[in-house]
Amino acid sequence: MFSIQQPLLVFSDLDGTLLDSHSYDWQPAAPWLTRLREANVPVILCSSKTSAEMLYLQKTLGLQGLPLIAENGAVIQLAEQWQEIDGFPRIISGISHGEISQVLNTLREKEHFKFTTFDDVDDATIAEWTGLSRSQAALTQLHEASVTLIWRDSDERMAQFTARLNELGLQFMQGARFWHVLDASAGKDQAANWIIATYQQLSGKRPTTLGLGDGPNDAPLLEVMDYAVIVKGLNREGVHLHDEDPARVWRTQREGPEGWREGLDHFFSAR
């Protein structure tokens, strides 16, 4: 049992979880966001999005100043009050976006893999793919430590591509809509553990953690949470955890922000 009155951190994915996959609406989650903010519970956004995108969304959601996890864990944006931490304001894990782009261009030219990265197109095209405005779409191209792409080849070639990336110290990760390439050492789980340890160091007590996500790339995050909400999503593979004890894991019946609200209701309303 736990409550929002005890030291608590909430880690949340964005698209398909806190945000509607199509409209990007988050209003069904608004009452819980307000309640958590009033209880001084940090809601830490965790996504494949760039830090530039997430800082914009963080402000929109009333979560500005809190830490966040961008680019599937390859980037940690530090909390405003953590200015004494080395690397402030952001910590980058592994190799840079530019280096990954060079690797991908070489693989495409020499081994003829078929894919389109966000670097290959303009913001108007990304806006068409995502439904974002052009100004918001431009923020999706500001990667620091990963590359986002659309795969346009066979499953067999994907397996070969994944193996080649692994040989080069990279990983190929599936998101709700797109695929992401980042350093093999990076991950939402490592980033979350770092943030948890930082809060513990600052407060002297390890906070209880609750994570919410809807896609395969959220599984590593949810695995390291004390409690997890698997929001019903669009991805056909879904989310599968090693420990799905009903006492710690809740699968929602609703999608997006309504599922997010359902998950919070499940763990807190009756407590």
From Swiss-Prot:
Principal subcellular localisation of the protein: cytoplasm
One protein family per Pfam: Hydrolase_3
Keywords noted in UniProt: Cytoplasm, Hydrolase, Magnesium, Metal-binding
Record carries keyword Magnesium: yes
Cofactor: Mg(2+)
Binding site for Mg(2+): D13, D15, D214
Enzyme class: hydrolase
Lineage: superkingdom: Bacteria
Protein name (record): Mannosyl-3-phosphoglycerate phosphatase
Organism per entry: Escherichia coli (strain 55989 / EAEC)
